[in-house]
Swiss-Prot record:
PANTHER family: ADAPTER PROTEIN MECA, ADAPTER PROTEIN MECA 2. The gene is mecA2. Homodimer. The lineage of its organism: Bacteria, Bacillati, Bacillota, Bacilli, Bacillales. The N-terminal domain has binding sites for ComK and probably for unfolded/aggregated proteins; the C-terminal domain interacts with ClpC. One of its GO terms (biological process) is negative regulation of establishment of competence for transformation. InterPro entries: MecA_C_sf, Neg-reg_MecA. This is Adapter protein MecA 2. Enables the recognition and targeting of unfolded and aggregated proteins to the ClpC protease or to other proteins involved in proteolysis. Acts negatively in the development of competence by binding ComK and recruiting it to the ClpCP protease. When overexpressed, inhibits sporulation. Also involved in Spx degradation by ClpC. Keywords: Competence, Sporulation. It comes from the Bacteria. The keyword Transmembrane does not apply. One of its GO terms (molecular function) is protein-macromolecule adaptor activity.
Amino acid sequence: MRLERLNYNKIKIFLTFDDLSERGLTKEDLWRNAPKVQQLFRDMMQEANKELGFEADGPIAVEVFSLQAQGMVVIVTKEHQEADTDDEFRDEFIEMQVTLDESEHILYEFATLDDVINLSNRLYNLDVTGGKLYTWDGRFYLWMEEEEQIQLLKADFIAILAEYGNPSTATIYRLMEYGKELMASQAIEQIHNYFVKKQNLS
C-alpha cells in the first residue's frame, strides 16, 4: 500500500492485488458494500492518519479506479462536514464510487527524466519500442497501447514499470489538454537512441 497526499483534503492510495489478497479481498469485492470492504477503508484511513496526518474527521468520498493488472488506485476526498460527530468512521459518511478502467492502455508517471531513460533501456532490450511521452506539472508520463506491449506478458511489463514509476490516474485527455507531448510515437526507441545509445557511443 502506497499513500500520497494530493492536497489538504485529498489523498491517493495505491493498492496492489497482493494487498487485497492479504486482506481476503478481490477486485470484485470493492463493488460490494461488504463489512470487510468497510474495514479496508478504515485501515486505509488509519494508515493515512499515521503517515500523512490526514484525519478523516467527517464525511469522505471514495473513488476506486481499477488499473487492469496494475492494481487499484483509491482517491479519498474529505468533504465539508455539516455537523460534528463523535464517530468519524460511521458507514453513512462513506460515499463510494467505483470506476473500472476497461481500456487496455497503460499510463505510468515518473518523477524524473532519468527514471524514464533507465526504463527505456530495460524495455528496448526486451524489444518494446512504442509509447507516447508527455510531461505535465514537473512529471513525465508514458502511455502505452495494448499492441505496444505484446512482446511481454502484461504482469511482467507492469512489474518493470513499477520499478521506475507509479500508475497514474490522470487521463490521456488531461495530458493532451494540459500537458506537453514530447514524443508522439515510438517513445521507448527514441529515448534509447537519443540518451542511451548516444551515451554509449561517446
